[in-house]
């Protein structure tokens, strides 16, 4: 994920910053504890596409 692109992307719900998880190909919102998938290089930034992080999942 391009660092400049990541700087301008925010969580569509809380407008907070996102963290790129390369191993799972997801963008993580720490505030809402949501993971937005990246499919074919395109972030799926819809709440309906996001998954909730499990309590044991650590956000880096």
Swiss-Prot record:
Q: Which domain of life is it from?
A: Bacteria
Q: Which InterPro entries match?
A: Trm112-like
Q: Which GO terms describe its cellular component?
A: cytosol
Pfam families the UniProt entry points to: Trm112p
Family of the protein in this entry: Belongs to the UPF0434 family.
HAMAP family given for it?
UPF0434
Its protein name is UPF0434 protein CV_3345
Organism lineage reads as: Bacteria, Pseudomonadati, Pseudomonadota, Betaproteobacteria, Neisseriales
């Amino acid at each position: 994920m391009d660092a400049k692109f990541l700087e301008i992307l925010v969580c569509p719900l809380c407008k907070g910053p996102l963290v790129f998880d390369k191993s799972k190909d997801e963008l993580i919102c720490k505030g809402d504890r949501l993971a937005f998938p990246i499919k074919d290089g395109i972030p799926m930034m819809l709440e309906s596409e996001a998954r909730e992080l499990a309590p044991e999942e650590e956000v880096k």
